[in-house]
Amino acid sequence: MEGGAKSNDVSAAPIAQPLSEDPTDIASNIKYHAQYTPHFSPFKFEPLQAYYAATADSVRDRLIKQWNDTYLHYDKVNPKQTYYLSMEYLQGRALTNAVGNLDIHNAYADALNKLGQQLEEVVEQEKDAALGNGGLGRLASCFLDSMATLNLPAWGYGLRYRYGLFKQLITKAGQEEVPEDWLEKFSPWEIVRHDVVFPIRFFGHVEVLPSGSRKWVGGEVLQALAYDVPIPGYRTKNTNSLRLWEAKASSEDFNLFLFNDGQYDAAAQLHSRAQQICAVLYPGDATENGKLLRLKQQFFLCSASLQDIIARFKEREDGKGSHQWSEFPKKVAIQLNDTHPTLTIPELMRLLMDDEGLGWDESWNITTRTIAYTNHTVLPEALEKWSQAVMWKLLPRHMEIIEEIDKRFVATIMSERPDLENKMPSMRILDHNATKPVVHMANLCVVSSHTVNGVAQLHSDILKAELFADYVSVWPTKFQNKTNGITPRRWIRFCSPELSHIITKWLKTDQWVTNLELLANLREFADNSELHAEWESAKMANKQRLAQYILHVTGVSIDPNSLFDIQVKRIHEYKRQLLNILGVIYRYKKLKGMSPEERKNTTPRTVMIGGKAFATYTNAKRIVKLVTDVGDVVNSDPDVNDYLKVVFVPNYNVSVAEMLIPGSELSQHISTAGMEASGTSNMKFALNGCLIIGTLDGANVEIREEIGEDNFFLFGATADEVPQLRKDRENGLFKPDPRFEEAKQFIRSGAFGTYDYNPLLESLEGNSGYGRGDYFLVGHDFPSYMDAQARVDEAYKDRKRWIKMSILSTSGSGKFSSDRTISQYAKEIWNIAECRVP
């Protein structure tokens, strides 16, 4: 290998043997790529980086063969195909996943050993693709893995963000955001498709043609260029695509005259605006420009994807003669992952009417039979509402279409259900508020989709009973539940190989990796002392690995013999990281007041918290700062730091999760009941034998049912109690627990430094008012939370009981595979079938 360690080279000259499974041939192929697919000059050769690039290129050879076979097979069979549109994907590292799914992990490990390298070290060179932020993006990626594993004809569509959301640094000031330059070196996993380019128009105006038809003209036109990422299934030949769009301007939009005149910015204005579209995920939208940019991103994804879908439909149908538009919904299913891709609805209508010449009724029939919508939230601020003025400016033709959909919807309801007249203001798509008229994107989705689903049973029940109750009375069969799931490949098989090996040994099969329900058979061994010893040993190996990682990234030394207590998720007041840290503060204060002998009787604990706070979300950033300040004080206090450590884990992403989750023993899912649609990290922790402390919210409800109430540390108000508790608070009826007051007072005493935490603490105080009145019920749930934590401490001391609970947690996780979720989508929403590559 060029510039590498010569002594370990396999001696033969490198040859490309892309499909061989012999380690010597693979080593030769890796060497071949190092020489002939160079990503570095020979003078700047970094062995690990270069071995990663060459190994990835070598694995990609196999993927491309399977990818082409899959595409040709789908083309020949012409099945109905699903297209999954999402603003976010959180793929994680592709190399680990590819060698695992292709079942070539050991062969590649041996090949790299022959070259003097370790696969584990080579894998570490890959940066996570920064294409998402939280659960929404990770769910989309789990779904893609399951679609391929189940041999379903399905593609994902997204945007190729240059800098992602942001990279999180933790400094003395708290969270600092810098660009996440994941493409800084290169990504060997994406293939640019220079032949797949579509025009995307913004602004302009609508022209009425002599025929009476309408045409959107003028404005500015950018190009959408496709980058494809292969999505291999587990032990199957099917390899699907994630197609990511990048924005660019055409060469005609570069003004050479102005450039040569020294007017460089003016010469390339459109090029500059094109670069903005895929620069970052969720650009700040406090300004008019920010709102326009977000809307541009959403439309860019919708329009490019639809043009591509229509082109493929025509190509496949025309191969049989000519295409019939009535066939479109029989060949295409489009799933909108939340409201971000809602503009798919008016854009499909526009393409069918204005470009293909169909009438309104036929276009509407096709659109409403093709599109389905997944709702992910009941949080009012997350239900998108766009200013009508901004929409008219950017997308004038689409606003005409939305107006017509709204008008026809209102007319239908008034004629068929006059009893709903007083509900129309909240049901209609266009809100004609005199001061700030908006478009309700969720309403547009519900009116225009054939199916609407929630993502956990409780969430779907709340949607039907509250958020969309009036629509349910009109379309009772339109609403479904599809409880979320996770891929067992990434979330246990690959990230916790020791535990996976034990499960396979005791079940006498590895079929559980694709049939997770088989885990239930572990229950019969839940008291077996031999399994207990193996289980505890695997958990300890994962904890030691995690302790090394924490020392490496934070400099904090943690004890693997302490209870590892982890809360990792987006920082948000409803997810209540504040409840967690207030509990930690109270624990610290009590430990501080104990004698050394008393401390020895406590359960030592390491509390880890991680997640990103949106750059403009001030209170969330204050919570990050508080966690880091508490950690600084607690970890350097010699009286207590053998019994309590507090760590903020920076820049939480998929790869960090793959380290944290296998090493966790207690995981906190403590949102205010009724506010978390589902949650999926709870499923990942439970699958890895981690016990949950949580509220009856989202998928917690179903996890508790599956693993058994005795194996779940429950606390807090229930979803149906929350509205009354908020009313009681407004009426001054809330009496705070003394422990809660003590924890807040301890912060105010300056115990954790001079930072002004009053604005954060005041959000928990008073009875009402903006940013006050403890909307998320931290104070109400604090006493039952502390009592549940005391139960955790007691349970952890009884090792036999704890390990049994851990085994039962894993064995009860069979329902939460994304394979089950996707099978249900395929049968009950998309109406698509397996299309296995022979």
Curated annotation (Swiss-Prot):
<keyword id="KW-0021">Allosteric enzyme</keyword>
<keyword id="KW-0663">Pyridoxal phosphate</keyword>
<comment type="function">
    <text>Phosphorylase is an important allosteric enzyme in carbohydrate metabolism. Enzymes from different sources differ in their regulatory mechanisms and in their natural substrates. However, all known phosphorylases share catalytic and structural properties.</text>
</comment>
<dbReference type="GO" id="GO:0008184">
    <property type="term" value="F:glycogen phosphorylase activity"/>
</dbReference>
<keyword id="KW-0328">Glycosyltransferase</keyword>
<protein>
    <recommendedName>
        <fullName>Alpha-glucan phosphorylase, H isozyme</fullName>
        <ecNumber>2.4.1.1</ecNumber>
    </recommendedName>
</protein>
<dbReference type="Pfam" id="PF00343">
    <property type="entry name" value="Phosphorylase"/>
</dbReference>
<keyword id="KW-0963">Cytoplasm</keyword>
<dbReference type="InterPro" id="IPR011833">
    <property type="entry name" value="Glycg_phsphrylas"/>
</dbReference>
<keyword id="KW-0808">Transferase</keyword>
<feature type="modified residue" description="N6-(pyridoxal phosphate)lysine">
    <location>
        <position position="684"/>
    </location>
</feature>
<comment type="similarity">
    <text>Belongs to the glycogen phosphorylase family.</text>
</comment>
<keyword id="KW-0119">Carbohydrate metabolism</keyword>
<dbReference type="GO" id="GO:0030170">
    <property type="term" value="F:pyridoxal phosphate binding"/>
</dbReference>
<dbReference type="InterPro" id="IPR000811">
    <property type="entry name" value="Glyco_trans_35"/>
</dbReference>
<dbReference type="GO" id="GO:0005737">
    <property type="term" value="C:cytoplasm"/>
</dbReference>
<feature type="region of interest" description="Disordered">
    <location>
        <begin position="1"/>
        <end position="21"/>
    </location>
</feature>
<dbReference type="InterPro" id="IPR035090">
    <property type="entry name" value="Pyridoxal_P_attach_site"/>
</dbReference>
<dbReference type="GO" id="GO:0005980">
    <property type="term" value="P:glycogen catabolic process"/>
</dbReference>
